[in-house]
């Protein structure tokens, strides 16, 4: 079933809900780039339902709350662990979620990925996710394309899954030349220009984004271009970080910015680019692609998950293999070379 708002989704479970607990924490300081803030923005502004953003350590709060007040709801996003430290905290999370359900609380679970990006502990993740899928009152996904994938993976009926589109990111459009000059003044490392076409890979630096392959494919090309790789290096991704430095340090066509990009600089980054490349090895939904669309960027991305719905979008080029990715890159370079 497709719905138009979280309010509609929640009302279908309980018309008298007065408190929604959200996990993980909403980053209220990033109202233009934080997915969770944008998803709950209407409810936050309306202020009729209290939105309680909860950390891992504060899970006990929603358990205590539902014990005294049934007009509450738990909206959980993701449910993953990446290392020993986070796996040790998982039993506490699961106990709190289980007790909350036992005491009569309703759960909405938003599925963002069928597998963790780092693909660690896959069988354990699958068992936990199937348990969560059974426990949830409603499972939320961002596209019709995800319904069958989530239903078959977690062995649940499609009727338990609600579709609410990914929130849009507000865009601040700036003339490209202005954006490039300002971006270079902040991150250019002495550069005076960005030669078109400007390819962009942005967000946290991580292996699942296929950055190694993008570098290898572009480095073989002769036409001029610029590749910007911008974002903070995620925990455990030092090997990838070192690879990028080693492969690009002598290539003036690549600008590597391994740093957190402040929200106010995203308009410069997006407006300065021509094409955003997303080389995910596996994906269900992507906030990065939604942001690129907000800035009217051309997009190269895999034919997977929610992205399959973009197959007829003239601004999007979808690929099924490394060869098709290479073809898209060469076609883009040829287009710019020929004016």
Range-by-range predicted roles:
Residues 151-152, 168-189, 207:
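Acidic anion/phosphate-binding donor-loop and adjacent secondary structure
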Residues 315-324, 332-337:
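Conserved acidic donor-binding segment of nucleotide-sugar-dependent glycosyltransferases
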Residues 202, 258, 276-283, 302-303:
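Short Ser/Thr-rich beta->loop micro-motif in glycosyltransferases that lines
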Residues 202, 226-241, 259:
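Glycosyltransferase donor-sugar binding loop
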Residues 134-151, 156-175:
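Donor nucleotide-sugar binding/catalytic pocket of nucleotide-sugar-dependent glycosyltransferases
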Residues 268-284, 294-297:
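Acidic donor-binding loop of glycosyltransferase active sites
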Residues 186, 190-209, 215-218, 227-228:
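Conserved donor-binding/catalytic core segment of Leloir-type glycosyltransferases
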Residues 241-263:
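Nucleotide-activated donor-binding/catalytic signature segment of Leloir-type glycosyltransferases, i.e.
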């Amino acid at each position: 079933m497709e719905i138009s708002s979280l309010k509609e989704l929640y009302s279908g479970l309980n018309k008298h809900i007065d408190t929604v607990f959200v996990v993980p924490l909403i980053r209220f300081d990033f109202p233009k780039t934080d997915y969770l803030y944008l998803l709950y923005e209407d409810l936050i502004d309306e202020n009729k339902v209290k939105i309680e953003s909860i950390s891992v350590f504060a899970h006990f709060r929603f358990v205590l709350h539902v014990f005294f007040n049934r007009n509450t709801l738990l909206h959980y996003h993701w449910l993953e662990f990446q290392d020993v430290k986070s796996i040790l905290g998982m039993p506490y999370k699961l106990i709190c979620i289980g007790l909350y359900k036992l005491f009569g609380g309703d759960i909405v679970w938003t599925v963002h990925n069928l597998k963790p990006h780092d693909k660690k502990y896959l069988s354990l993740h699958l068992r936990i996710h199937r348990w969560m899928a059974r426990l949830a009152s409603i499972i939320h996904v961002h596209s019709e394309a995800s319904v069958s994938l989530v239903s078959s993976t977690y062995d649940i009926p499609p009727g338990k899954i609600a579709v609410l589109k990914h929130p849009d990111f507000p865009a601040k459009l700036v003339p490209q030349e202005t954006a490039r000059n300002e971006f270079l003044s902040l991150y250019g490392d002495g550069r005076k220009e960005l030669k078109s076409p400007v390819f962009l890979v942005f967000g946290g630096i991580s292996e699942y984004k296929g950055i190694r392959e993008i570098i290898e494919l572009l480095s073989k090309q002769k036409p001029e271009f610029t590749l910007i790789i911008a974002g903070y290096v995620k925990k455990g991704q030092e090997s990838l970080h070192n690879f990028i430095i080693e492969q690009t340090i002598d290539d003036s066509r690549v600008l590597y910015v391994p740093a957190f990009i402040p929200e106010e600089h995203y308009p410069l980054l997006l407006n300065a680019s021509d094409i955003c490349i997303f080389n995910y090895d596996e994906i269900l939904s992507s906030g990065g692609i939604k942001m690129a669309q907000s800035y009217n960027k051309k997009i190269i991305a895999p034919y997977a998950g929610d992205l399959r719905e973009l197959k007829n979008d003239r601004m999007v080029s979808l690929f099924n293999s490394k060869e098709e990715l290479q073809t898209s890159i060469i076609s883009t370079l040829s287009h710019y070379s020929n004016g």
